[in-house]
């Protein structure tokens, strides 16, 4: 999941300045702040939809930092009709993950 690289993400985002990151789970407020600084958004891809991803990613253009292992390496892929994707963290600091977590926390207090 995205959380595995979350501790490195703010520095990588500030140095590489990506426009989009695609993952499954949320990332920290520190990562969200770095994304806001560079105008980056996080798109969530649904877990369990690997067949959709495989069909929409026909070509590997490059692999970077492969010494980190395949799951943590940065993959440069050609995409065609990739989706569904949800803007889960936008470039203004809003996080769907945090909003849902806050909503659940408020409701659990009422119980």
Task: Identify the role of each PLM range.
Residues 1-82:
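Feature captures the catalytic cores and cofactor-binding loops of soluble hydro-lyases/lyases
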Residues 74-111:
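Long, charged alpha-helical interface segments
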């Amino acid at each position: 999941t995205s959380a595995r690289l979350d501790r490195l993400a703010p520095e990588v985002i500030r140095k590489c300045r990506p426009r989009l990151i695609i993952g499954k789970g949320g990332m920290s407020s520190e990562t969200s702040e770095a994304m806001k600084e560079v105008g980056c958004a996080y798109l969530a891809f649904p877990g369990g939809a690997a067949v959709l991803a495989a069909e929409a990613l026909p070509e590997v253009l490059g692999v970077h930092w492969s010494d980190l292992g395949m799951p943590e390496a940065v993959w440069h892929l050609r995409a065609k009709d990739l989706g569904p994707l949800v803007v889960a963290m936008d470039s203004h600091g809003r996080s769907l993950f945090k909003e849902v977590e806050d909503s659940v926390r408020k409701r659990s207090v009422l119980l």
